């Protein structure tokens, strides 16, 4: 774990387990963490409520929510309620319908803008190995390419002091993420990973299944969705 004492980090905070764990890791490393969430036209607001709850629980220095309506042109089952959400499991080599065109590129760009404005040293991302199997914008080669773009496209980058993209979970299994979240005291019960809204996770979408399997493996079935207990 790199030492980041006295550093400022911008943490993209979706409301899910992964981004919450990444933010907590940045805090443990000594960072002053600013949370950044996005209302991008997703099917429900439950994850934004979770992001606010996590920011409060982790006592983040600041938390901002930015509106970027990616639902205007659709292209994803996460922004278009007419499309069915996937429930058949993650398939190798297949980009699922929950991929939102350009989402991470938009989010990271805005995060870098905030980082440069605030003099932040890091941009913390919760992408991980599970996402690698599906989403093109959660892979190590994408992150490497974006770091190059960030260095070339900003004043601080050209001056050799641009913020570093930090994705500590990128090669972790979901079980390891859960175990680290438990160790760090991340409020898992306040996080939201389900593709659907409502008062309780559906337990059948791909995201719920991956999360529940990891919680079971980590010995915390009590935190699983009620459908899988």
From Swiss-Prot:
Taxonomy, superkingdom: Bacteria
Gene Ontology process terms (BP): queuosine biosynthetic process
Family matches, as InterPro entries: QueC (IPR018317), Rossmann-like_a/b/a_fold (IPR014729)
A molecular function GO annotation: ligase activity, forming carbon-nitrogen bonds
Keyword field: ATP-binding, Ligase, Metal-binding, Nucleotide-binding, Queuosine biosynthesis, Zinc
Positions bound to Zn(2+): 194, 202, 205, 208
CDD domains in the cross-refs: QueC-like
Residues annotated to bind ATP: 13-23
Catalytic activity: 7-carboxy-7-deazaguanine + NH4(+) + ATP = 7-cyano-7-deazaguanine + ADP + phosphate + H2O + H(+)
Free-text comment on the cofactor: Binds 1 zinc ion per subunit.
Known EC number: 6.3.4.20
Pathway the protein takes part in: Purine metabolism; 7-cyano-7-deazaguanine biosynthesis
Cofactor or coenzyme needed: Zn(2+)
Biological role stated in the UniProt entry: Catalyzes the ATP-dependent conversion of 7-carboxy-7-deazaguanine (CDG) to 7-cyano-7-deazaguanine (preQ(0)).
Similarity annotation: Belongs to the QueC family.
Protein name (Swiss-Prot/TrEMBL): 7-cyano-7-deazaguanine synthase
Organism of derivation: Synechococcus sp. (strain WH7803)
């Amino acid at each position: 774990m790199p030492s980041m004492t006295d550093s400022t980090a911008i943490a993209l905070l979706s409301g899910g387990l992964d981004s919450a764990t990444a933010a907590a890791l940045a805090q443990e490393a000594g960072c002053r963490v600013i949370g950044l969430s996005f209302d991008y036209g997703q099917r429900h607001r439950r994850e934004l409520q979770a992001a606010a709850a996590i920011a409060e629980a982790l006592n983040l220095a600041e938390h901002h929510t930015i509106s970027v309506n990616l639902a205007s042109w659709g292209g994803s089952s996460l922004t278009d309620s007419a499309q069915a959400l996937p429930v058949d499991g993650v398939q190798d080599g297949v980009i699922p319908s929950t991929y939102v065109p350009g989402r991470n590129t938009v989010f990271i760009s805005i995060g870098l803008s905030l980082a440069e404005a605030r003099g932040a040293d890091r941009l913390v991302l919760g992408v991980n190995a599970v996402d690698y199997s599906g989403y093109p914008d959660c892979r190590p080669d994408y992150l490497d390419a974006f770091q190059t773009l960030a260095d070339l496209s900003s004043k601080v980058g050209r001056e050799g002091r641009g913020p570093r993209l930090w994705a500590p979970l990128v090669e972790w299994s979901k079980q390891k993420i859960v175990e680290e979240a438990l160790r760090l005291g991340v409020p898992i019960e306040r996080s939201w990973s389900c593709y659907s809204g409502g008062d309780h996770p559906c337990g059948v979408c791909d995201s719920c299944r991956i999360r529940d399997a990891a919680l079971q493996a980590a010995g915390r079935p009590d935190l699983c969705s009620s459908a899988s207990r």
